[in-house]
Structures are given as C-alpha cells and as structure tokens.
Amino acid sequence: MTIERVQHSGAIVVSALVEWEGVKWLESATYYGYTIKAAKASFRDSCKRLNYTIERG
C-alpha cells in the first residue's frame, strides 16, 4: 500500500495492489479533508466491503 499527500491540494492518495476472484490490479482512491490515518482506514473498509484482498508485498 502506498500513501501520498498531494502538495497543491492537500489530498491524500491511497493505492494498493488488490485481488478479486483471481484478478489483480492497482486500486487507487483520493481523499480530500481526511487525515492519513482516516484515509487508510477508509480505503481498507472500501476494499473489505467490495471483497477485494489487499496484496502484501
């Protein structure tokens, strides 16, 4: 999982390699007005709700 703060907007971009039913891809989400901790938790919750597995590595 990669977490970046965008300088000009203050947004937080969370990206991770995810897997669903044998297919893997890079999933990214942009969070405005979130703390890094809250953005990371929201990303994890979204992946869990969609039954995506976040790949470790």
Predicted segments, located by residue:
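Stable alpha-helical structural segments in soluble proteins, enriched in small hydrophobic residues
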Residues: 39-43
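Short, mixed-charge low-complexity intrinsically disordered segments
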Residues: 1-2, 44, 48-57
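Short N-terminal "domain-start" leader segments
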Residues: 1-19
